[in-house]
Every structure is written in C-alpha cells, then in structure tokens.
Amino acid sequence: QMQGVTHYMIDELEPDEEFHVVRFVTMAKEYLKEIYADGKIPIIAGGTGFYIQALLYDIDFTEQQCDETYRRQLEDLAREHGAEYLHGILREVDPASAEAIHANNIKRVIRALEFYHLSGKKISEHNETERQKQSPYNFAYFVLTDERAKLYERIDRRVNAMIEAGLVEEVKKLKSMGCSREMVSMQGLGYKEILAYLDGGCTLEEAVYIIKRETRHFAKRQLTWFKRERDVIWLDKQAFGYDDAAILKDMISILEEKEIISHE
C-alpha cells in the first residue's frame, strides 16, 4: 500500500503501550521537523479528525488535569454497566462531545467527563475555542468525498480484504501475547470485534457484519466532524468523474495558490 513512499508513525509502538492525542502530536511534530529539514512537504493522511485538528491548530491540552479517583470511578461504571451507560452520562453534561465520541471509545468518554468534572466546562467548548486559533502551519486540508452508497461499498470491500489478509490470525496472535479489549491498541475497528469472535461472543460472520456496520458509522461521524472544520477543502470524487489524475491536478493547483509548493 505504501508504493515506495516513505511513511511515518507505522509499527512504532508495542500493542501494550499507551497512545493518546498528546503523544500523537508530540511524535508527529518531531517528524514534521525532520521532513521540513529535508526540504520536503509533509502529507498528513488519516481519518481521525480530532488528531488532525490537534496537530494543525496546536491545541493546548495542559488544562486537562487528572483526577485518578474520579477516573477509576468512571472505569468501574463502564465495567459494571457498560460503555453505553457511561456514554449516556456524557450525553447529559456535554451533548456535543457525546455526538463526536463513539460510546466504545471509553478512554475519550472518560477524558471528556473528567475535564467537565475538574473544570466545570464542556470539553467540546474548550476544543471549539482552541479550533479558532490560527494554525502555525501553511496547509491545505483536503477531504475526499463520494456518494454514500459507493463509500459503503468501498468499506465492505476493505473489510473483506482485511479478513483475507489475515486479521483473525493477527488478533489471535495479539491475544496470545496478553492483549485484552481494555488496551487502546485493541479498540481499533476490527480488533475488538474479532476479539469478541475469538472469545466465543459471536460467529465470524457476525463479527464481519459488525465491523462493516461500525466502520460505516465511523465514516459518517468523521464526515460530520470535517463539515465543522473551517479550513476543509472538499473534493467530490463523483464531480471529477472518478479521475484520480484530475483530482491530483486540482490539488496541486490549490497547493500552488497557497504557495505551499512552487510552480514548476
């Protein structure tokens, strides 16, 4: 998939290592310096809008202190009553965050509740304030889009390809290494569903169905997120007749206009 292009931040951490947005931004900034020092332009690719936003706008997370006792209480609630119950609490105090954060992303739900508990403020409002900051970077924020039916077809094909490429065997190996569903590394789409299958909670067919369904929901949430971002440049694949060369030409033209790259 990398097609000879140097990629960063892939296969850098062990499955049991903690990973969060602050660590992502710290690591990404180091690579940005390295790439710029090489005289090249970095391309940030991905679908997690919150992480992209945090990097582009240099969002400050220092106000988000820690209350270990309260955090443990929330973790206990999630274990006893389930992720949806905890998500319901967040929905009551911060509906905007509840809309943006999936119930299964327990760590982010807890972080949002903890922020509210400590500051009396909604983390969604804090993030919105941070989002209004001027970015220290000159950048172009492209989001490719397509009609929903075609997007869902691509998601289904991708999930099928993941299974064929050995996702079950990969999760089986991770499980044998002691990786559990509580770990951040096992919260990714596909991993927790296959883990449920390996634990006897569902059939493989059911697990695949759930992965496809949850990936569609994720795509829908991400599109909603990107629509809120003020600097997004939308590229409708259908409008370009699904011509990748035409899309690339348009992107290059915009990059030249923004003086991110120079005219050849």
Residue map of PLM features:
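Phosphate/pyrophosphate-binding catalytic cores of soluble transferases and nucleic-acid-acting enzymes
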Residues: 1-264
